[in-house]
Structures are given as structure tokens and as C-alpha cells.
Amino acid sequence: MIYDDKIFGDLCHKEFLVEREVKKLEEIYLEEVLPEDPKPEDEIEFTFNCPLKFHITSGKIVKDNREIYTFNIQERKTQWNDSIFNFSEIIKIKIPPLKENGLYQIHLYEMNEKIYEQYLSIDNFEAPLWSEESIIYHIFIDRFAKDEKEVEYSENLKEKLGGNLKGILSRLDYIENLGINTIWISPIFKSTSYHGYDIEDYFEIDPIWGTKEDLKKLVREAFNRGIRIILDFVPNHMSYKNPIFQKALKDKNSNLRSWFIFKGEDYETFFGVKSMPKINLKNKEAIDYIINAAKYWIREFGISGYRMDHATGPDINFWSIFYYNLKSEFPETFYFGEIVETPKETKKYVGKFDGTLDFYLFKIIRDFFIGKRWSTKEFVKMIDLEEKFYGNKFKRISFLENHDSNRFLWVAKDKKLLRLASIFQFSINAIPIIYNGQEMGCSQYRDILEGNRTLHEHARLPIPWSDDKQDKELIDFYRQLVKIRKSHPALYKGTFIPIFSDMISFIKETQEESILVLINIEDKEEIFNLNGTYRDLFSGNIYTNSLKLGPMSAHLLLRIDH
């Protein structure tokens, strides 16, 4: 079985990708920047695709409305494109180091007419060091815990059930005991719906989820336990009940009208959902409002960063502006995007985020462990190539399930597979997420795609807190797995060295340690020949010469004879 939650939508269809490529080739677009995230001391090379309807003659680098550098086109190359059955021009531009941190713009001209503008953040910002050691616990607030109690189940899962910040606070001991050091909370702002992704007020907490004092206390108590709090932030769209949108809707002459994208009486939305109008993030006032809101929760409450919802929605220039402004003031904060895209397109967000939720990795993990789509050789090769493609600077964040997908166990029907997939997830450099309840063995009652509908609420059921509803052995397994990862830097920042065999096998290595990862997903024993002496990080057993792996089993082996 190959299972697809359709998170990628049309991106998995070749016809869609070809059509998108055709549209892209009709406009000027930035194909590549080298280096990908330029520093002040770097010479920078830009590669643009230029269609036939344009002829780029010159350009400028601009900062704060001041011309910093002018250039003529240094290199032109003709390119044939089968997808449009026509030529286009590849333009390469090299500029000297810009020397100063700043938010720059590159302008391209045809004679005296500006025909293209792209923002570029030149800076020394990086993901904070604490992020590479992060193990993220993803909490869907409305379903997690209500004060010190369990959230009561309701047949109407589309209504707010009342999970709140006090509920998270009441479970901090549990989260700390798991070994978690970062919590990502779904949107807590005043909202029309139970999921919080349609915000009525970016500066207020929804009363059903708590108060600002509750948030301050949660951040303080969590930080005292070595746990950071990351919030879910939604810049692409807001609730139609937001007073800003209501004023724009009712008054065609309002300055707020330009904060949105009106077309006559209609307006652009989030995937056609009329209750979620899209924000025009090319409008300076709208941009400033969103940035100020994001800064507010960091400055006033000590938030450690944001998961940015629907990051492919806003124009990519917005992210250059947002990232530069936030990191300039709060360099130790962490920002990762919900970038549901191909790896090639995702990489264009380097320098605009610290990292991304890795949807490609999510898909191939589920396709392999549940769907048995790939051979072990193909799977290990894909992981190796993705590691090399992204490198370690742009942080990938891994997950086996989330609030928009079916639970892993709902699809796999096998806790052994969940354990094996989790061991793999915790053995690669991507920052791992545990979705609340995953560690307890939570599943669901109905498929989110039942009847060709999208029933996300069935992956968002209330979390069970009574002992008889939790798998204590599975919780203990996750606790041990978290401890192992945190104790061995090779697992979260080591070099990935593939070994092609009849099972998943690879080495994670730093100068200080080498760990051999072996995962057998077959229903038969496998033998692996060892080239040294190893200690199993789960059992403590010592192995030399060879190791017999039982069916559906895994070993994390620390080499001890160096």
C-alpha cells in the first residue's frame, strides 16, 4: 500500500509541474543566487531567466532608496526550453561584496524602465545554536488539556473544545519528563475557529485559550525547565471578522482596502475560503503591521520564534523583509516555514527562514515504512541525496504526522512500524517533531479524506490523559529515544554515511563518535557484518563481528573500539 494524505496536492503530478514551469518561463525569475545566503563579505552571483518579451540591459543594487551599485549585463546565454518550445535567455550578474548588513533590492532595467525587483537580505544571521539540539513537541492547543483536566470529546469536532494555556502548564512536568526542550503551540490568537488559523486580532489571545498572564507564566515555567516556546504565526491571511478586514470591506475608500486584494466586490482568499481573506503583503502598511505583531509576542512574552503558516502564500520578498527585521532585533530566535513545495523550490527560502518543515521527507518516510514503495537502497540513497542537497545550515524539521495528516498509526496499524520510523527520524540531522499524542499511541476514528472530503479535525482529537488510554511502554520508548538523541551529537549533527545493504543502514559520524544505524523493516531475520566493536544505545549490549537483527527491529550502535 502506498498512502498519500495529499499534502502535496498537485505538486505530485507531472502535468501540473510542467504547466507551472511553462508559466514561470513567461516571466523574469531568479533561478539561483550564489552563495545561497550571502554575507557582507561575499561576492554574489545572480542567475536570472529572461523570456523573449524582455531584454534586460542593466541593473542597480539599492538600499534605503539609495543606489549602492550599478551594473551592465556581464554574461548572456541562450537556452532552449522544450516545455514552451521556444528560447529564453539566461542572464548572469556578479556584484562585489556589499560589505554592510542590510536589506537590499536588486532592480533590473530594460533601457530606462524598471522591469523587475527582488529583495535580498545581506546579513550574518544563522539559526541559533540551540535549534540544532531541539526536539519539538507540537501541541494543538484546543485539544491538548483544559486546565488540569482532559478535553472532553464532542461529536462536533469543528467547535472550540476549550484546551488552553493552563492545560499546557499543567502538563509541563510530563513534557519535561519526555526530554522535550521545545514546544510549538498552534495559533493562540483571538480567532473565529477552533484551529486558530483565521486570526481576528494579532495582538490578543483568544479568551477560551487563556490570557496574556497565562502565556507569561507558561513561558517562564517552561524556560525554567529548559524548554522554549514557539508560536504558530499566520501572516498570509486573517479572519473575515478581523476589524481591519471589515473596515476594508465596508469602505471602498478606506486606506485599509489596499491591505487586501480586491477584485470588484470579490477578494482573494486562502484556497477559496471566503472567511479567510488573503493579506496583500506587498503593501508596506500591512507588512509593518504583521512584523510589529510578530515582534510584540517576542518582546513582551519571551517567545523563542515562530512556525510560519502557509509560507508559500506571501510573495517571497515579504519573507526577506520579515526575516531581516525580526533577526536584526532578536538574533537568537528561530523561524521555520510551512513550505509545501518541491525541494528545488524550497531551497529558494534559504536566507529567508532558519529552516523548513520537511514535507518531502514526511512523504518518503511514510511511503517507505507504511507503503513499502522504495527498496532500502533507494530509500537510503534518497536520504543521502537530500542531506547533501540542503546541507546543515538550513534546518530541516522532520515529522511522521501532524494536524493536517492522518495519524501514522491510523494508516500503519502497527506500533512496531511507528517505533522503527521514529528511530530513523531521530537518527538523522533534521530536527524531530513529536505531534502531541503520537508518543501515547494516539490514532483516530475516521480518515481525514473520507468521502473525498478534508476532515482534518479527525487528526485533532482530544489527547487522553487517563493511564488506561495511554500506551505507557510507547511513552517510555520515546523517552529513551529522546534521551539517546540528546546524549549523542552524532545523531543530530553528524555526517551521514550511507551503507547499501538489505536493511536501512548508515553511519552518523563526528570527530568524537561514530554511530551505526540498522533498521530491519522485514518480517524475517537479517545478518549484518560488523567491522568493529559496538555498544547498543538501547540495551547496552556489546557486539563484534556480526549482528543478527530480528524481524521488525532496530539498533543504534556506538562504536567503542576507536
Curated annotation (Swiss-Prot):
It comes from Dictyoglomus thermophilum (strain ATCC 35947 / DSM 3960 / H-6-12). One of its GO terms (biological process) is carbohydrate metabolic process. The keyword Hydrolase applies. When compared to AmyA, AmyB produced larger amounts of reducing sugar. Binds 1 Ca(2+) ion per subunit. The active site is at D309 (nucleophile), E338 (proton donor). It comes from the Bacteria. Belongs to the glycosyl hydrolase 13 family. Its cofactor is Ca(2+). It is found in: Cytoplasm. It is an enzyme of class 3 (hydrolase). Monomer. The keyword Transmembrane does not apply. Ca(2+) binds at N236. This is Alpha-amylase 2. The record marks D404 as: Transition state stabilizer. It catalyses: Endohydrolysis of (1->4)-alpha-D-glucosidic linkages in polysaccharides containing three or more (1->4)-alpha-linked D-glucose units. Its EC number is 3.2.1.1. Keywords: Calcium, Carbohydrate metabolism, Cytoplasm, Glycosidase, Hydrolase, Metal-binding. One of its GO terms (cellular component) is cytoplasm. GO terms for molecular function: alpha-amylase activity; metal ion binding. InterPro entries: Glyco_hydro_13_cat_dom, Glycoside_hydrolase_SF.
